[in-house]
């Protein structure tokens, strides 16, 4: 077999194996998934039986990790959405925002027909308006901040221990 054929076969093997390697979630993606799962599992909705439907905007860097089946089951039903129109008809109990601005997050909440919504943002570092929970991602470390005003208006109940955890992580 000629060298060029061997090189070609090696290249084919490498390229076909690349998608398998690329699908392995990174540590930060796993940490985001664990954080979101934890927040959802300590949240209660009035008049909801069964797992909540979490709509994940496709702009999220971690949309794949938040929806894929892993060794642990998810405490929510993930639905990927692309537009505000999809969000309005999705029947979600919560939203996970990617690049959507805090203003967009507020406007969607005001227009959405549901009274009880859990809102988690990936790119809302100030956490002053918009979502109730804002992820703070630095390298592989994932923490969160809580917007108590947004949470009090959300219609969902969150275990107070989660709020204390956010406070401890932000203080230390």
UniProtKB/Swiss-Prot annotation:
UniProt GO BP: bacterial-type flagellum-dependent swarming motility
First and last residue of the signal peptide: 1-22
Cell compartment(s), UniProt: Periplasm
UniProtKB keywords: Periplasm, Signal
GO cellular component, one term: periplasmic space
The keyword Hydrolase belongs to this UniProt entry's keyword annotation: no
Activity control summary: Inactivated by reductive stress.
Record keyword Cell inner membrane present: no
Purpose: Repressor of the cell division arrest function of DgcN. Prevents DgcN relocation to the midcell.
Name of the protein: Protein YfiR
């Amino acid at each position: 077999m000629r060298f060029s054929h061997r090189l070609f076969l090696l290249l084919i093997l490498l390229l076909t194996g690349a998608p398998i390697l690329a699908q392995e979630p990174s540590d930060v993606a796993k940490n985001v998934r664990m954080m979101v799962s934890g927040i959802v599992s300590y949240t209660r909705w009035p008049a909801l039986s069964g797992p909540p439907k979490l709509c994940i905007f496709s702009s999220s860097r971690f949309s794949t990790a938040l929806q894929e089946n892993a060794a642990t089951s998810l405490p929510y039903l993930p639905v990927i959405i692309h537009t505000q129109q999809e969000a309005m008809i999705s029947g979600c109990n919560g939203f996970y925002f990617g690049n959507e601005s805090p203003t967009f997050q507020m406007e969607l909440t005001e227009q959405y027909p549901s009274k009880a919504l859990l809102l988690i943002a990936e790119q809302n570092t100030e956490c002053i308006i918009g979502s109730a929970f804002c992820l703070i991602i630095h390298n592989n470390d994932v923490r969160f901040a809580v917007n108590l005003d947004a949470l009090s208006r959300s219609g969902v109940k969150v275990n107070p221990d989660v709020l204390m955890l956010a406070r401890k992580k932000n203080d230390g």
